[in-house]
Design a protein with these regions (language model features):
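Acidic, low-complexity, intrinsically disordered interaction modules
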Residues: 274-302, 308-309
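His/Asp/Glu-rich mid-to-C-terminal helical/loop segments that flank catalytic regions of hydrolases
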Residues: 215-278, 315, 319, 324-327
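Zn-dependent metallopeptidase/amidohydrolase metal-coordination segment
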Residues: 185-231
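Acidic/histidine-rich catalytic neighborhood of metal-dependent amide-processing enzymes
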Residues: 94-172, 182, 186, 193-194
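Short glycine/proline-enriched coil/turn segments at helix->beta-strand junctions
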Residues: 31-36, 52-57, 112-120, 143-145, ...
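Active-site metal-coordination/substrate-binding segment of hydrolases
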Residues: 50, 54-118, 128
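A non-catalytic alpha/beta surface segment that caps or lines the substrate-entry region
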Residues: 5-56
């Protein structure tokens, strides 16, 4: 695995709205790759890359912005052990965010651009602030693609085939992927660029794939190298084996603004002291459709439920004392 390239990507700090250094690096790096490659930019600053000539192309997308709680220190380093990579500032003696979400996806895109003769890639800006980049995508770029892969999921085994109540791909495409053979299982995911593309009318199958990062959006974010390599090999398998076009249109797209409240309730169970402002800061990138007043309502409902439950326990003990034992 090209860890030198990976750590170079981690070293470029690119918070949402400030991706200029990353764009400059990508343009420079891509133009020195072998083959017939063109790079263009839309009005929003998204990068579109075409390599080779073909009737249809495999297509990969990733986003180039990151979320972190502190800026990179001047001495930021991506440190590597046998198993993992993590961000660290020796001077400040603190862990710092890698940006592996989604620079691991960027890495996979670059490796595939280098390896294959015909491929399309898009690098989106500002995914973390509500998929702003992909909402400005030039959709004609996707007219001749067979499918779209986004490596932008934590862990090592998730194959995102739906988001909310919106399916992203066809059953035929899922069968062609052979996910179980490669250690992946279908899951429902969070809002990301491929959902935005589908909502803009993209008519081919899309998936989001785990790519080996953990603890995203925190300063303790890590990459497990073998899990990233597993993702790269899976993506290469798809490119090489899925040579048909896999059409898919959303039958009844629906995205509930309250669908992921259970996850927020779980976080409140873990730390009941969290405020609506804390939750908004933590989840604004995962659930950009939720506003601050939504978090205020969720906190209010949560605390009311637990207050009622505590009062019930005071009156009724553990809740089982007055029940008859049936034999």
């Amino acid at each position: 695995m090209n860890t030198q390239l990976l750590k170079r990507l981690y070293s470029i700090y690119s918070p949402s709205g400030k991706e200029r250094k990353m764009v400059k690096f990508l343009c420079s790096y891509i133009r020195q790759l072998p083959g017939d490659i063109s790079v263009s930019k839309d009005k929003f600053g998204n990068l579109y890359v075409v390599k080779g000539e073909a009737e249809t192309y495999p297509c990969l997308v990733s986003h180039i912005d990151q979320v972190s709680h502190c800026n990179h220190s001047k001495d930021f380093k991506a440190l590597e052990t046998r198993e993992i990579i993590f961000g660290y500032s020796p001077k400040n003696r603190r862990f710092e965010n890698l940006g592996a979400d989604d620079k691991n996806g960027v890495f996979i895109c670059l490796e595939c651009l280098k390896k294959y003769d015909a491929v399309k890639v898009v690098f989106f800006r500002e995914e973390e602030t509500g998929c702003k980049g992909s909402s400005e995508a030039v959709m004609s770029f996707f007219d001749d693609v067979r499918f779209v892969i986004q490596p932008d999921r934590k862990g090592d085994s998730d194959l995102i085939t739906s988001i909310g109540y919106s399916d992203l791909c066809s059953e035929k495409f899922i069968e062609a992927l052979e996910p179980e053979k490669w250690g992946y299982m279908e899951e429902n995911g969070l809002m990301t660029d491929i959902l935005t593309l589908k909502e803009k009318g993209l008519g081919v199958s899309c998936i989001n794939v785990s790519c080996g990062y953990y603890n995203p959006h925190t300063d303790e974010e890590i990459t497990v190298k073998k899990d990233l390599m597993k993702s790269l090999l899976f993506v290469e398998h798809i490119i090489e084996e899925c040579t048909d076009v896999y059409p898919h249109t959303q039958s009844d797209p629906y995205f509930s603004p309250y669908e992921f409240e259970d996850e927020i309730y779980d976080m409140l169970n873990y730390d009941p002291t969290l405020t609506p402002e804390d939750l908004y800061e933590m989840y604004s990138t995962d659930f950009p459709h939720l506003r601050l007043d939504d978090y205020e309502r969720i906190c209010r409902d949560y605390r009311m439920l637990w207050k009622e439950y505590d009062e019930y326990k005071l009156i009724n003990g553990n809740g089982y004392e007055n029940e008859k034992v049936l034999s």
